[in-house]
């Protein structure tokens, strides 16, 4: 257990309170985490994670989501961000003012929640906007018959399709993605309209 730790280097700052690690050095629990640093993409990450009973609240003025988008669109990757935890089973409430998806595209007012069980997202409901007319949403739901349904909609396709090598010329379109997974078999549909 680490009761409190602060690290400051130039403009970079890390602070954590009440961090409990497993024998395998995975996070069992954390009460508070503050991060303020510049990423390799030269974007300031300003993040506050606070545990409130059985929920975590993740708030941020600025969040670099570029690598997150790359990991979500890399179908060959088996990596899971939540694997840094030792059996995370909590709700994470998201309140992010500005989420960078690329150097020139970002979401405003990203809000929602993730329900995590055993380090996996079982339910999610996230809304954001690029502008007053351009929207974004991401949902994950589990049906009663064992299907995991993932839906992503973006009025701007560019931040997502630029990571797919087989898609060229669709940057201006609207992106709709749906995946239904059952018994380790997945069926996915990707639509790009109005390009």
List where the protein language model places each region.
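Membrane-proximal interfacial segments on either side of biological membranes
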Residues: 1-195
């Amino acid at each position: 257990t680490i009761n409190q730790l602060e690290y400051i280097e130039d403009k970079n700052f890390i602070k954590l309170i009440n961090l409990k690690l497993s024998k395998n050095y995975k996070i069992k629990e954390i009460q508070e985490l503050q991060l303020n640093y510049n990423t390799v993409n030269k974007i300031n990450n300003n993040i506050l994670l606070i545990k409130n009973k059985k929920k975590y609240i993740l708030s941020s003025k600025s969040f670099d989501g570029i690598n997150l988008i790359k990991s979500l669109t890399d179908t060959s990757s088996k990596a899971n961000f939540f694997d840094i935890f030792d059996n995370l089973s909590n709700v994470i409430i998201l309140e992010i003012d500005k989420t960078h998806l690329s150097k020139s595209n970002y979401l405003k007012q990203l809000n929602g929640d993730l329900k995590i069980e055993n380090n996996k997202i079982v339910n999610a409901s996230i809304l954001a906007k690029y502008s007053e007319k351009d929207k974004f949403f991401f949902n994950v739901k589990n049906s009663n018959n064992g299907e995991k349904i993932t839906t992503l909609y973006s009025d701007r396709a560019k931040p997502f399709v630029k990571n797919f090598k087989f898609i060229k010329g669709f940057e201006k379109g609207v992106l709709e993605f749906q995946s239904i997974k059952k018994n380790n078999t997945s069926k996915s549909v990707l639509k790009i309209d109005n390009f």
